Amino acid sequence: MEQHFLGCVKRAWDSAEVAPEPQPPPIVSSEDRGPWPLPLYPVLGEYSLDSCDLGLLSSPCWRLPGVYWQNGLSPGVQSTLEPSTAKPTEFSWPGTQKQQEAPVEEVGQAEEPDRLRLQQLPWSSPLHPWDRQQDTEVCDSGCLLERRHPPALQPWRHLPGFSDCLEWILRVGFAAFSVLWACCSRICGAKQP
């Protein structure tokens, strides 16, 4: 039986096609070296000509244009841009300038508390329970201590720029949630948490 099996294997082995020998990689000339232009993708650090994205897709978060810092959305973040002597303007999303220039008389008395609540949002308030606890200890004791960070982020704390980027992402997310919550409470009549 072993002879029969070995015979079948030998016939199958011998009837198999011979694979071509591996070819060495082609020699790359200096003309073939990259980087090749990719017209559909943004270039890192280059300002886009499209005025809607404000360079958000092509820049890391710590190099975003000064539109957010000039409008006071992130007062705790220091910008690398030179300070402007012009009076900061109220923040508005691109394309919404004309809607905000409506006369003040159109705003009803019922909408005024919501507008005040939106203007008084705590942009630098703690975003997590561990930050809230630390903030109350700071207020009660009167001494300034460094904020605690979640244990899951401790291995990443030594990377330069990671903490700043993460904090920026959390602040923007909190701001977006707060604005959406204020809109929902006005529409649905829900109470703010």
Swiss-Prot record:
Biased composition, class Polar residues, residue ranges: 78-87
Sorted UniProt keywords: Receptor
GO MF, one annotated term: signaling receptor activity
Tissue-by-tissue expression: Widely expressed. Highly expressed in lymphocytes. Expressed in both resting CD4(+) and CD8(+) T-cells.
Pfam family, one: ANXA2R
Residue span of region Disordered: 78-111
Physiological role: May act as a receptor for annexin II on marrow stromal cells to induce osteoclast formation.
Entry protein name: Annexin-2 receptor
Species for this entry: Homo sapiens (Human)
Organism lineage string: Eukaryota, Metazoa, Chordata, Craniata, Vertebrata
